[in-house]
């Protein structure tokens, strides 16, 4: 007797295998469509180059001439993809430019030391651009440096930078010669960590605004204070500094026991595992005392060093790019401009520190969330403060009686995590609540309403709107908002997902909409990984209240853009052990992103032609054996299975069917494998 097996679409990972009778319980690289499982589509590499860093945001748009672009921001660089090629448009931090730096070489060594005349504020891992080199020593030439990018290998002091060449020096020489050094804007760390304990990297205080001042006199590479004597350090100002505590100067931590006027007393140099170093007069000095217990295990701190993030949008045909907790850049997409770098949005009123940015439509106000209360003052950044520009302007932000610029502070939560533009409102999330921001016109311009509590989002890029409904991933569940109320979504894979998320890396969570198959996917890092390595998908087209359809996968993408501008979704995948190739940076460390066209064929295809098969599977829960006339057995029937007739729609490659049988729910299953080479293969057991 033939027995038809039909199972509900979606996975049930909340129940035991026996409790999930009639359902699927495991799957990988598979989706459910029209009620049946199928393998997901393949992907094809768009460009042979691998990008530096991990993708953090991606945006596609069309300019006024009809040209199609994709912008990709990683934790290291900003790129344009246009007609099959990448273009590096990473902005330069012009305020940090160093001219007249000198070279020092050591015979037989690849290390070259660049000495600057003033403090460079660089960190190991930064990218620098050298130019106008003259009289280069050690057997190197100007062509080895002019218009060449380098990764900073080490920072021995406030005025020295070490880089690694591709070949060794022929002689020891220097300091001599000159070179101009430009610095790529620092986007932020690769991974999210807790605390400011040494080893987590403070990024020169550039990740979060700290109380800061400058040295009033140089420090030598010794154990003494200002000028190489005593136990006092003179600062330009001590306003806001703790009465006793710790300061950070370049990469050195220094403790002090008291303050007299603008002088720190009782200093101890090179504390908590750091080394003493020379620091020039005017070097930036941070008060680290109130942010973390220095020397404590970072896992005990609730202070988060967030990973480098971007928000990419278009304003008309121009790309607007916000570095998380920093400022706004703009790139104009005229064809001759493809190799021109993004530049700061100019103006004396533009915010310099914001957590996220959106453009409201159709009224066209640029909105910054988690931004500064005093324009052009990053130290006044308030994580709960919202500010918007004058209508149709990116540079006018000061409210007046004759414009529509304005601001509003929200209250529920400790910080605003992100915002998106919805069909009828801008949606803003804190770590605990959701707000709507609607254009209402003069005199207030925007009206705010809190529409949900205890429903915060998990990361800046974890929310999307589809068909007028906002969906997002919170710290412990999935939510949706249909314009009326926030609802917690029933999910039969939630324990599997939320018990396996690396909460030290959850800022990397990225949402993806695949309208081709009615899917919303969240890519997340599992407990076993510092980077995105898994995903969970909700099928919004076929789900019902009685049967919400969810499934999980090891498909890992750090960014994703919906089809529309291009006919398929485009996505980035980060690989920590892969060497980046674009742009060419001498001495660059491993850690690169592939750029994929999704839903292309059935395999993984690299630009080199290398093809890897994608092995998808689905696994059901236990299934009772049926008795006469379809009677369910509930365990009292025994059966011998002699043949299987698969019913496949379209099959590429072989399909293996595994039967796992057991006499009792707690018995060890016995598995047998059978391979179907075509969709009409009959299997005899």
Where do the PLM segments sit?
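Beta-propeller and closely related beta-pinwheel folds
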Residues: 42-61, 90-95, 292-305, 337-509, ...
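Hydrophobic or amphipathic alpha-helical targeting/insertion segments
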Residues: 88, 186, 317-331
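Beta-sheet repeat architectures centered on beta-propellers
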Residues: 1-96, 189, 194, 311, ...
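Structural hallmark of WD40 beta-propellers
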Residues: 66-69, 317, 424
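Small/polar beta-strand repeat architecture
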Residues: 1, 89-232, 236-308, 337-339
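Repetitive beta-strand solenoid architecture
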Residues: 54, 74, 116-118, 157, ...
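Short beta-strand segments and strand-loop junctions that repeat across beta-rich extracellular domains
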Residues: 77-81, 189-198, 328-333, 373-400, ...
């Amino acid at each position: 007797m033939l027995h038809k097996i039909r199972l509900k679409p979606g996975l049930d990972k909340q129940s035991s295998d026996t409790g999930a009778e009639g359902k699927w319980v495991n799957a990988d690289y598979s989706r459910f469509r029209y009620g049946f499982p199928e393998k997901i589509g393949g992907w094809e590499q768009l460009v042979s180059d691998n990008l530096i860093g991990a993708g953090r945001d991606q945006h596609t748009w069309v300019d006024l001439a009809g040209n199609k672009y994709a912008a990709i921001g990683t934790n290291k660089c900003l790129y344009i993809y246009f007609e099959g090629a990448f273009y590096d448009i990473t902005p330069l931090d012009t305020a940090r430019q160093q001219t007249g730096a000198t070279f020092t070489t050591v015979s037989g060594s690849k290390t070259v030391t660049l000495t600057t005349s003033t403090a460079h504020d660089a960190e190991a891992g930064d990218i620098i651009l050298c130019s106008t080199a003259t009289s280069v020593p050690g057997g190197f030439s100007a062509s080895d440096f002019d218009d060449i990018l380098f990764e900073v290998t080490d920072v021995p002091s406030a005025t020295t930078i070490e880089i690694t060449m591709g070949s060794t020096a022929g002689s020891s020489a220097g300091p001599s010669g000159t070179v101009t050094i430009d610095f790529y804007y620092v986007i932020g760390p690769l991974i999210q960590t807790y605390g400011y304990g040494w080893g987590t990297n403070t990024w020169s205080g550039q990740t979060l605004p700290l109380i800061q001042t400058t040295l009033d006199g140089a420090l030598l590479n010794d154990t003494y204070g200002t000028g190489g004597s005593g136990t006092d350090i003179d600062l330009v100002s001590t306003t806001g500094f703790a009465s006793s505590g710790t300061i950070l100067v370049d990469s050195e931590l220094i403790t002090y026991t008291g303050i007299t006027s603008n002088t720190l007393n009782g200093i101890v140099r090179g504390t908590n595992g750091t080394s003493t170093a020379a620091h020039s007069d005017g070097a930036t000095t941070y008060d680290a005392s109130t942010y973390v217990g220095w020397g404590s295990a970072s896992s005990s701190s609730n202070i988060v060093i967030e990973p480098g993030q971007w928000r990419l949008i278009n304003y008309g045909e121009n790309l607007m790019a916000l570095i998380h907790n920093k400022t706004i850049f703009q790139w104009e997409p005229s064809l001759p401009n493809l190799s021109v770098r993004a530049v700061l949005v100019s103006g004396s009123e533009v915010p310099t520190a914001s957590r996220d940015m959106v453009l409201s439509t159709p009224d066209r106000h640029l909105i910054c969330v988690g931004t500064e209360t005093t324009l052009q003052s990053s130290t006044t950044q308030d994580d709960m403060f919202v500010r918007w520009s004058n209508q149709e302007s990116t540079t006018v932000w000061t409210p007046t009686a004759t414009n529509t610029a304005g601001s509003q502070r929200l209250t529920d939560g400790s910080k605003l995590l992100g915002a998106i533009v919805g069909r009828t409102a801008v949606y803003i999330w804190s770590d605990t609540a959701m707000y709507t921001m609607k254009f209402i016109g003069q005199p207030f311009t925007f009206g705010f309403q809190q529409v949900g509590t205890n429903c915060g989002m998990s990361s800046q890029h974890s929310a999307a709107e589809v068909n007028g409904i906002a969906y997002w991933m919170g710290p412990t569940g999935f939510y949706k908002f249909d314009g009326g109320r926030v609802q917690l979504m029933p999910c039969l894979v939630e324990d599997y997902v939320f018990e396996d998320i690396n909460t030290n890396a959850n800022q990397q969570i990225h949402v993806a909409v695949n309208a081709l198959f009615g899917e919303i996917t969240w890519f997340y890092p599992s407990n076993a990984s510092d980077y995105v390595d898994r995903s969970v998908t909700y099928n919004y087209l076929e789900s019902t209240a009685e049967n919400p359809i969810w499934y999980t996968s090891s498909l890992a993408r750090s960014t994703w853009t919906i089809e529309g501008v291009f006919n398929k979704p485009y996505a980035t995948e980060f690989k920590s052990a892969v060497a980046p190739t674009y742009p060419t940076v001498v001495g660059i460390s491993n850690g690169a992103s592939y750029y994929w066209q999704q839903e292309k064929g059935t395999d993984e295809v690299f630009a080199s032609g290398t093809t890897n098969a994608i092995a998808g599977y689905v696994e059901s829960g236990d299934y009772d054996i049926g008795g006469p006339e379809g009677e369910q057995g509930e365990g009292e029937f025994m059966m011998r299975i002699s043949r299987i007739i698969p019913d496949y729609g379209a099959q590429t490659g072989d399909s293996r069917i595994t039967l796992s049988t057991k006499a009792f729910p707690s018995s060890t299953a016995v598995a047998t494998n059978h391979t179907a080479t075509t969709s009409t293969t009959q299997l005899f057991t």
